[in-house]
């Protein structure tokens, strides 16, 4: 995918690296590799602004559409690009869900954090599916050392649950990794045709709506409270992972109708 030459907000790579090399490298790079102390990380943070981090699941840049298609059909994406930075040569560390998420939060390759397999959903920890080592520094532990409250809302899928009395997920399942609050249960992918769009197995809860509602409620309560500690709120959405439905006529228009009948 060639970089756009029409984006007035585009910053040359050399200039971006020069600007961000100081605090960003010290904070997120060397700390994860254990080359600087946690105290250095805490001191490197400037004014300790509040942080809200949104994650989407299995989303990639539009690559095969005509020029201008994404701006015309993805208005919210266009708005975000116009008001922020777009990294056009960014690559995921792994194709597998669990491995990629663990790399994102630790800054390590799967061969380094060792949680390289996508974890089986709805099962407790398995010896054949290595878990992320809680002793490894990650985004949450670094921010907590810097005085932040770190709250996670949404899809986790970085570790399997710790066996609770009733076998369900509990908030403590991710507190081992430095997070102050979660919002169990976890949510993976639900791609059956009757539950397109992130519904759970019982067809009772739209996961992304649940996550957004939980995050909005937490943020409203926090901002109206007397707690003036800086916070990092991570909102991890399931979609577009589950947005797999398409208009019925696409089968016929694309010549797939008979193939579809053979597998339904």
Name each model-derived stretch.
Residues 2-264:
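Formylglycine-dependent sulfatase
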């Amino acid at each position: 995918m060639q970089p756009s030459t029409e984006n007035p907000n585009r910053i040359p790579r050399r200039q971006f690296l020069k600007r961000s090399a100081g605090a960003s490298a010290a904070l997120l790079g060397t700390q994860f590799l254990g080359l600087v102390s946690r105290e250095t990380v805490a001191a490197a943070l400037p004014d300790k602004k509040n942080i809200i981090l949104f994650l989407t699941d299995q989303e990639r840049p539009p690559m095969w559409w005509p020029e201008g298609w994404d701006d015309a059909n993805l208005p919210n994406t266009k708005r975000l690009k116009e008001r922020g930075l777009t990294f056009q040569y960014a690559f995921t560390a792994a194709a597998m869900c669990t491995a990629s998420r663990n790399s994102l939060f630790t800054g390590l390759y799967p061969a380094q954090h060792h949680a390289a397999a996508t974890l089986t959903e709805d099962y407790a920890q398995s010896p054949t599916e290595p878990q992320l080592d809680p002793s490894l520094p990650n985004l949450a532990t670094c921010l907590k050392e810097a005085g932040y409250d770190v709250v996670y809302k949404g899809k986790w899928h970085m570790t399997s649950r710790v066996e609770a009395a009733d076998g369900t997920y509990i908030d403590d399942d991710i507190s081992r990794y430095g997070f102050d609050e979660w919002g169990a249960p976890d949510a993976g992918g639900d791609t059956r045709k009757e539950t397109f769009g992130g519904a759970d197995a019982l067809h009772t809860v739209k996961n992304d709506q649940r996550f957004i509602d939980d995050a909005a409620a937490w943020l409203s309560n926090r901002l109206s409270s007397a707690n003036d500690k800086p916070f990092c709120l991570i909102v991890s959405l399931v979609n577009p992972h589950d947005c797999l439905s398409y208009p019925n006529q696409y089968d016929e228009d694309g010549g797939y109708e008979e193939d579809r009948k053979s597998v339904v």
